[in-house]
C-alpha cells in the first residue's frame, strides 16, 4: 500500500512540474507574451540581446563582419552624438568603409531634438521605427511622421526633422547619381498605403516605397514572409543591400554562412554575395531593404 501511495505521489508531482513554468518539461516560448499589446516594430527597438543561456558570456555577440557581408546585431551598436543633429544619438551601421556606396544608420532622437542637413548632393530617406517626428521644408509646410511612415529628401533639399518627445529613425543616405535632366521629388508616405506588387515565382509580399522611374537611383522595399515561407531564388546580383529586420525571425544565408536573425538585426550585402532568407517562428517576418537601381554598374 505504501508503494502505491508513493507511486501516486510521484506521478502527481511530475504532472504539476510539467505544467509549471519551472518544470523540467517546460520550454520558453519563442513568442513574447505581450506581443499583441506592443506597437508595431516594438521588437526592433527592444530586441533580445542574447539567449538566456549565454548571458554569462560577457563577450558574446552574434555580429559578424566579412569581406562581402556583415551581420550587425543590437548588442554591437555603438551610439554617439550625430554630427549636425541636436540632442540625437546615432549608430552608423553601414558606411563606405565596408565597401558600400551608401550610409545606413539609426538615429535616436531625444526630447526636443532636431536633424541636421546631409552634405551637398546627398539624398536621404528616413523611416520611423518608433515615436514620431515632424518634417518641415523651406516653404514652412510640415508633416507629422509616425511609426511606419517615411520621407525621401532629394539632394540639396532644405528640411528639418523635429522631435518633441522621442523617436527612432533608420536613415539611408547616398551621393545622388545624376542622370541627364531627370530629377527626384520630395516623397512622404507610409508602408500601408503602398500597393502589393507581383512577385512571380515567389510567395513573399513586396512593397516599394519610392517610384520606379529612372530618376531614382535607389529604392527601399518592404518584404513580408509568413512563418515557413522562404525566397525561391538564391540571389546573386550586382546590387548592394542594407537590411533592417523589423519583425520576426528566421535564417539568412550569406555566402556559405547561415545566420539566425531576429527583429533589430542589420545586414550589409555586397555585390554578388549569395543570399537567401527563410522565415521561422510564429509571427510574420518583415524587413526593410535598400537596393540601388536604374544606373549602369559601369
Curated annotation (Swiss-Prot):
Q: What is its EC number?
A: 3.5.3.26
User: Could you tell me which Pfam families the record lists for this protein?
Assistant: Cupin_2 (PF07883)
Which keywords are on file for this protein? Endoplasmic reticulum, Hydrolase, Manganese, Metal-binding, Purine metabolism, Signal
Recorded consequence of changing residue 287 to A/F? Loss of activity
Q: Which residues bind substrate?
A: 235, 275, 287, 291
- Reactions catalysed, as given in the entry: (S)-2-ureidoglycine + H2O = (S)-ureidoglycolate + NH4(+)
* One GO CC term on file: cytosol
Signal peptide start and end residues = 1-20
Q: What is the effect of changing residue 291 to A?
A: Loss of activity
Q: What class of enzyme is it?
A: hydrolase
| Domain Cupin type-2: residue ranges | 222-288
- The entry marks the following residues as binding Mn(2+), namely 235, 237, 241, 275
What are the subcellular locations of this protein?
A: Endoplasmic reticulum
Designated name of the protein: (S)-ureidoglycine aminohydrolase
Gene that this sequence comes from: UGLYAH
